[in-house]
């Protein structure tokens, strides 16, 4: 068995004295593991850093085997990603999100989105918006997609201001007004018009929105907690937009 694909390094684990087991997100074969011989060598360690884009060749006798990777560098961005807290936490948080999906399950659109986000993690506003959209895409692929295109009550496609916590569907400002205190806010940049830039308030609302549904549909049923890196990313992105912001008291303030 052999195949070749574009991939992004998610992480590595030591295996023996000189080798590692690499975890990558491939474009056409999803999240995949493989042994990299001499992966701890001076030549390979800089290549096998989270966030780097590589070309991998996977070989194994049978498809169900772990197999071996041969890895060639394409874009070595890991050093740059270590320069800001937003980038450091962002790489870790996206890896944790991808681990919610079955191994070897192809999600080419998530691979493409991951590459875009990795190139924008230096800009907190762009990174925050792209990260929220990435979380929405993961929710959708897990079968829990939100419907933000029209009002659940009236069918209206304008002035959408809320999201029902029960149905995950958008609600217009007028239809949702009587229950506004029980609704989740729909950030303008996620609306169907899509002509609003993300700012501190809208990103705060967006992180609450995706955090709520990830907790309800994924983390709670599986008996797991959200990755600490998600809270770190949220904190770093919002603090970059508002340097006067104090450290939030906990993940429930924004993340869920």
From Swiss-Prot:
It comes from the Bacteria. InterPro entries: ARFGAP/RecO, DNA_rep/recomb_RecO_N, NA-bd_OB-fold, RecO, RecO_C. GO terms for cellular component: bacterial nucleoid. Keywords: DNA damage, DNA recombination, DNA repair. SUPFAM superfamilies: ArfGap/RecO-like zinc finger, Nucleic acid-binding proteins. One of its GO terms (biological process) is double-strand break repair. PANTHER family: DNA REPAIR PROTEIN RECO. Belongs to the RecO family. Involved in DNA repair and RecF pathway recombination. This is DNA repair protein RecO.
């Amino acid at each position: 068995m052999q195949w070749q694909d574009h991939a992004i390094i998610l992480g590595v684990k030591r295996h023996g004295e000189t080798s590692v087991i690499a975890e990558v997100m491939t474009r056409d074969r999803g999240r995949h593991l493989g042994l990299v011989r001499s992966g701890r060598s001076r030549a390979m360690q800089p290549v096998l850093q989270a966030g780097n884009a590589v070309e991998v060749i996977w070989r194994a006798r049978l498809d169900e085997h772990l197999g071996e990777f041969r890895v060639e560098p394409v874009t070595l961005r890991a050093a740059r990603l270590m320069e800001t807290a937003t980038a450091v936490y962002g790489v870790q948080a996206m890896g944790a999100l991808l681990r919610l999906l079955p191994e070897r399950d192809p999600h080419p659109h998530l691979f493409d989105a991951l590459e875009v986000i990795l190139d924008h993690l230096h800009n907190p506003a762009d990174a925050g918006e792209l990260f929220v959209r990435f979380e929405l895409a993961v929710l959708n692929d897990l079968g829990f997609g939100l419907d933000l295109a029209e009002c659940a009550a009236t069918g209206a496609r304008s002035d959408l201001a809320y999201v029902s916590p029960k149905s995950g569907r958008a609600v217009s400002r007028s239809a949702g007004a009587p229950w506004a205190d029980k609704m989740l806010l729909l950030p303008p940049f996620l609306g169907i018009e899509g002509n609003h830039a993300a700012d501190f308030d809208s990103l705060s609302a967006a992180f609450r929105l995706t955090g709520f549904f990830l907790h309800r549909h994924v983390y709670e049923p599986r008996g797991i907690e959200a990755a600490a890196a998600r809270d770190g990313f949220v904190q770093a992105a919002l603090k970059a937009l508002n340097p006067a912001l104090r450290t939030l008291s906990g993940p429930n303030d924004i993340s869920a």
